Structures are given as C-alpha cells and as structure tokens.
C-alpha cells in the first residue's frame, strides 16, 4: 500500500509564516508538520507520494535523502480531489490520503481494517469542519461541510486521514466541479456514503488541524510536553536547567541563564548570558537570545537574533530576523478576552494569550513594541520607538516621525 500526502496549498491563513515556506514545513516541536505525519505512516506503506506545488523546493530539499518519498507536482491547485487524481498513474492498489496540515498522535492501524474509511476527531467547534454522522457498525451516514450550528448533529468531524480503494479514482474522474470550481475529495466521499461503503474511525488521542497561527503554538506546546531531556550542547557556569529540555550539540548556554522546560534549543544556537528561556519554547538552528532577553511559549525560526533586553511571548518569529534592543511583544489584553487577529481581512477570535506573528527577514530598531496578535510581513523594517498596533504588509518600511526640538538652554 502507498500513501498520498497533500502539500500543494499556499496556507494563506498562516501568513506571514507561509510567505516563505509551505504550510507543511512549519515546525512543531522542532520538526515540520509533514515530518510528524510521515513518521506515523512510513512503517505501513511502501511509497509516500507528496503532492507538491507552492514552494515545492523547500519540501523536496528537506526530504531528499528519504528513499520512500516521491514527488508529484500539482501545477494548479484545483481542489483536494484534483490533488489526489494527480497520483492516479502511480497508485496500483489501496492507498492512504492525508492532509499535509493535520498533526495527530494515534496509530493508523485501525483505519487499515476497512476498505474505505475516514479518521474522525471529536471537537468542540464542529461548525468549522466537515461534520460526520455515524450509523450502525461505524458506517458513515452523512457528511455535512461546515454546517450552521442548528444543523449540527454530531461533534465528530472529518480529521483529514483516509484509507481508500483504487476505485475512488474513477469516482473522482466523474465528479463535476464544486461551486468553487474545484474537484473536492469530500464529494467522492459522499458517493461512497450513498453506497454504504465508507466507515469512520474515531481518533482517541491528540489531533489538530493547523489552520491559524495559534494552532501552531497549541500543537507545539502539546508535543513539547512529550519530549525527553537530552543535553548535548555546551553548558557554561551558573546555568539553571529545569524540566524536560533538549539542547543539541553545537548549542551554547552562557553563564547565569535560566532554561525551563519543556523547551528545545537546536544546534548552533547561543543563549545568554543572563537570558531566560521559559516553557514551551523552541529555538531553531543558529538562533541567538542575548543578555537579559526572555522568550516564553514561542517558536523562533533559524538564524534569528534577539540580542538584548527583549521580551518575546506566545509568538512566532520567522527566520533571519534581527531585533533591536528592548523589542517587546505584548501577548495579553487588559480585558482578558481572546486576542483578535486579522485573517484574510476578517477579525477572528484567537486565544487569551497571543503575541506577534512575524515573517522572515524582519528587522526592528530599538524600543519597538508589538501589540497582541499583530502580523508583520516578511522583509520588513520597523524603525526605532514604534508601537505596532496593526498588521504590516511584507516589504514595508515603518518609522515614526517624531520632531526633535533643540533650543538653547536657559541660564
């Protein structure tokens, strides 16, 4: 049996992080979402076909040494069903299909017992997903995409993991495009439901559909709490390390720094002196957290520098960023309500604590502050003494026009 993983989409709800990488390459607990998926299935399949499109080189380069993986280009993103169809000539028998942006803990063993099956997850907000109604013997009797609250009959939703027979390709080929003009995999599933040929298997463990920045941080927190301590880097004098912490070889923790796990500090990173890394933090390769800086519950991407007197909380900071002295990310509203984030032009409630979401190659001057939930596009410059209270598009230069008044002093 082979597997197909859908990785071609742009992930626009995760801008600015996905301005520079495909969504499946966003790191969760130090490794890409798609790597977590592959680890779950690779012992069950002979080949893994990654359906790639947007920024495909990032995926291909990362997995170039894995002999099980092959790549199929979806030149135009014409729907999930169309993406699966691109693999038709490569798949000879039954196969798995997985969305490239779902992360989960359960084994896939149970779904393999059926000819056609969908993994299900029990969630608190089913209106945001495809809601599944189960009948006798785990047969699916209804699938309703993003229903109104009054239409919801179940909290079980389509978890984006499928076991399908080869005959599904024939169903997909005969589907009419949806209202969006796309070939939808869910329309093929509805055909199977009509014929009583689709089963549902409920996942009992953790599952998350990574659709928003706070989903990234939530999944990161969950999987960090599964790590086992391993300290291979250089730990200098008077360093305090508590909890489960991974410090890779080549990382350096300088004197008087405090590391509280769970946390991961990757190779080439330098922390301190007198730095504070708090729980649920990941420092990717070659990052620098300097004197009297504090990082809490955040993901700091490769080659980013947060040199001194800065605070980063509940934030995602892209690669190759450089923060000026006393750069601060606020992460909590005065009224304790969920932080509002602008997603594709609409205000969306996120979570109680959320800092800044900053793209790659952003530089800040001294004393820059970011209000909760703001997003800063890639390759932007933020001048000194700015308070950023709104989203900034990529390639922007932001500065403050304060007038400096100089007069003769009084005698």
From Swiss-Prot:
Residues 205-224 are annotated as: Linker. It comes from the Archaea. In the N-terminal section; belongs to the N-acetylglucosamine-1-phosphate uridyltransferase family. Keywords: Acyltransferase, Multifunctional enzyme, Nucleotidyltransferase, Repeat, Transferase. One of its GO terms (biological process) is UDP-N-acetylglucosamine biosynthetic process. It catalyses: N-acetyl-alpha-D-glucosamine 1-phosphate + UTP + H(+) = UDP-N-acetyl-alpha-D-glucosamine + diphosphate; alpha-D-glucosamine 1-phosphate + acetyl-CoA = N-acetyl-alpha-D-glucosamine 1-phosphate + CoA + H(+). InterPro entries: Bifunctiontional_GlmU_arc-type, GlmU-like, Hexapep, NTP_transferase_dom, Nucleotide-diphossugar_trans, Trimer_LpxA-like_sf. Its EC number is 2.7.7.23, 2.3.1.157. GO terms for molecular function: glucosamine-1-phosphate N-acetyltransferase activity; UDP-N-acetylglucosamine diphosphorylase activity. It is an enzyme of class 2 (transferase). Pathway: Nucleotide-sugar biosynthesis; UDP-N-acetyl-alpha-D-glucosamine biosynthesis; N-acetyl-alpha-D-glucosamine 1-phosphate from alpha-D-glucosamine 6-phosphate (route II): step 2/2; Nucleotide-sugar biosynthesis; UDP-N-acetyl-alpha-D-glucosamine biosynthesis; UDP-N-acetyl-alpha-D-glucosamine from N-acetyl-alpha-D-glucosamine 1-phosphate: step 1/1. Catalyzes the last two sequential reactions in the de novo biosynthetic pathway for UDP-N-acetyl-glucosamine (UDP-GlcNAc). Responsible for the acetylation of GlcN-1-P to GlcNAc-1-P, and for the uridyl transfer from UTP to GlcNAc-1-P, to produce UDP-GlcNAc and pyrophosphate. Acetyl-CoA binds at residues 384, 401. This is Bifunctional protein GlmU. Residues 225-411 are annotated as: N-acetyltransferase. It comes from Methanococcus maripaludis (strain DSM 14266 / JCM 13030 / NBRC 101832 / S2 / LL). UTP binds at residues 6-9, 74, 79. N-acetyl-alpha-D-glucosamine 1-phosphate binds at residues 80, 130, 142, 158. Residues 1-204 are annotated as: Pyrophosphorylase. The active site is at 308 (proton acceptor). The keyword Cell wall biogenesis/degradation does not apply.
């Amino acid at each position: 049996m082979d597997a197909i993983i859908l990785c071609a989409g742009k992930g626009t709800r995760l801008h600015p992080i996905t301005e520079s990488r495909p969504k499946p390459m966003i790191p969760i607990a130090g490794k890409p979402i798609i790597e977590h998926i592959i680890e779950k299935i690779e012992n069950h399949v002979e080949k893994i076909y990654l359906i790639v499109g947007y920024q495909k080189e990032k995926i291909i380069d990362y997995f170039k040494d894995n002999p099980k993986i092959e790549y199929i280009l979806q030149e135009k993103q014409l729907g999930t069903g169309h993406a699966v169809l691109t693999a038709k000539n490569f798949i000879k028998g039954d196969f798995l299909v997985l969305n490239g942006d779902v992360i989960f803990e359960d084994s896939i063993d149970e779904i393999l017992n059926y000819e056609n099956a969908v993994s299900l997850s029990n969630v608190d907000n089913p209106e945001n997903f495809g809601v599944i109604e189960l009948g006798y013997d785990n047969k699916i009797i209804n699938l309703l995409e993003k229903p109104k609250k009054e239409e919801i009959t179940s909290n079980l939703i389509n978890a984006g993991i499928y076991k399908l027979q080869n005959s599904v390709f024939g169903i997909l080929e005969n589907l009419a495009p949806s209202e969006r003009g796309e070939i939808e995999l869910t329309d093929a599933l509805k055909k199977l439901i009509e014929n009583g040929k689709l089963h549902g298997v409920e996942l009992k463990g953790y599952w998350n559909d990574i659709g928003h920045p706070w989903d990234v941080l939530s999944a990161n927190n969950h999987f960090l709490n599964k790590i086992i301590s391993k300290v291979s880097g250089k730990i200098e004098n008077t360093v305090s390390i508590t909890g489960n912490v991974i410090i890779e070889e080549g990382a350096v923790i300088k004197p008087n720094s405090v590391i509280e796990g769970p946390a991961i500090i990757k190779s080439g990173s330098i922390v301190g002196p007198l730095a504070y890394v708090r729980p649920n933090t990941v420092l990717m390769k070659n990052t620098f957290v300097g004197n009297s800086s504090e990082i809490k519950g955040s993901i700091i991407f490769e080659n980013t520098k947060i040199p001194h007197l800065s605070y980063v909380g509940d934030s995602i900071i892209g690669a190759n960023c450089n923060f000026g002295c006393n750069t601060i990310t606020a992460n909590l509203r005065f009224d304790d309500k969920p932080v509002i984030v602008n997603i594709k032009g609409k205000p969306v409630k996120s979570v109680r604590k959320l800092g800044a979401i900053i793209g790659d190659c952003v530089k800040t001057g001294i004393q820059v502050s970011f209000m909760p939930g703001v997003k800063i596009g890639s390759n932007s410059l933020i001048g000194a003494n700015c308070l950023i209270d709104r989203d900034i598009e990529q390639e922007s230069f932001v500065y403050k026009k304060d007038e400096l008044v100089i007069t003769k002093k009084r005698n």
